[in-house]
Amino acid sequence: MNTHFTAAVVGGGPAGLAAALALSAAGCDVLLAAPPHRAHGGAPDNRTAALFAGSIALLKNLDAWERIASHSAPITGIRIIDDTGGLLRAPELVFTAAEIDLDAFGWNVPNSALTAGLIEVAQRTGSRVRLHSTAGIVKAEIGASAVTLTTHEGATFTAGLVVGADGRGSLCRQAAGIGTRSWTYAQSAIATSFQHGRPHRNLSTEFHRPAGPFTTVPLKGLASSLVWVERPDEAQRLAALDEPAFRAVLEERLTGLLGPVGEITSRAVFPLSGLTAEAFGRNRVALVGEAGHVIPPIGAQGLNLGLRDAATLADCVADARAAEQDVGSAAVLDAYSARRRIDVTSRIATVDVLNRSLISALGPVHLARGLGLVALKTLGPLRRIAVREGLAPASADADLLHPDGARRLSERASGAARHSAA
């Protein structure tokens, strides 16, 4: 049994799965070490993720989207409603995908369908991706030419490059000696999904409220997912309500936009926090997803960032393979870290400023936010630039984020693109 791989991915969430498949597309033999996927049984995962166009392109390039699309709902418009109660109330603002010549901004995808679709592809890639079920990696030892991973069950594997996709408490990040900066907000989010009487018309609606955003995102049919940000004590109180009482409060907050509220799925409450790693790659370890950055669930940026990590890492590894370089070398990881820094830093800053502008008690802050929304409503070119940058930042230019990216990445890894240009 082979125990050495070009790359090993630790963690089986969507970002880790995408990283394993992306590295496979770049020509690597990949170990994916993750807990077993429970397609049946256990508590259902009712979470969803709004994925933008670049993330959908990545899934298409990985041959996963056709397995996921039927479970997902398009987001063709984004509506922002100022519900802060301030003296200057911004007008209702609606962005449409047609403004920037798209059919949809993105798709709202159930996490369970996303994970299952990616795993199905990984299982069909033959020997290129090897799935190893484990309760966890307990040790990662950095060597001169490889990293040795030890599983909870005692198995050992080596890899020239390890991808830490093991979450905010990442053992891989700690083993690589990468520090972090973290912070918390005096807020918690309630996450759930619900059925409703009126069509959502594929509009995502975000109420800007003093305690934080209250956001609905369309699901298939007469249903939407909800992320409701509140003060921690209020979030716990709301989550503890029985279903009829919670339904009544939810209908009040929605102001009739979606009609009567029907069945509500289980509610989860989690505190809002942020984290960013001081580097996204070092000592043969590359970080993807929440191992490298944690962002509040505002503006649907978190998982999209993680998928862009996976696509960018594949680019850097493909370049190394074409040049016959060590894929875990400092040069490769420095290049990856540099390419991800602008995107991650700008997303975190944007979400942080927006969130703090809502909960701030300072009048000038509310005035600035309101004037910004007015400008976006009245200035078409500015609005289109803002929307395009929010969905597909110029700094995120990896092959797999674009149509025909799988072919381009394969050529990059083989050096064909370089030879044809020479």
Which sequence ranges carry the predicted segments?
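Conserved FAD-binding catalytic core of PHBH/FMO-like flavoproteins
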Residues: L59, A146-R267, L272
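FAD/FMN-dependent oxidoreductases across multiple families
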Residues: Q236-G328
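N-terminal Rossmann-like FAD-binding beta1-loop-alpha1 element of flavoenzymes
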Residues: F5-L32
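Generic enzyme active-site microenvironment
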Residues: L32-A33, G164, V288
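Conserved N-terminal helical subregion
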Residues: T3-H4, H71-A175, W183-S188, E243, ...
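Glycine-rich FAD pyrophosphate-binding loop
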Residues: S24-R47
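C-terminal helical "tail/cap" subdomain of flavin- and related membrane-associated enzymes
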Residues: D315-A422
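N-terminal FAD cofactor-binding segment of flavoenzymes
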Residues: D45-G85
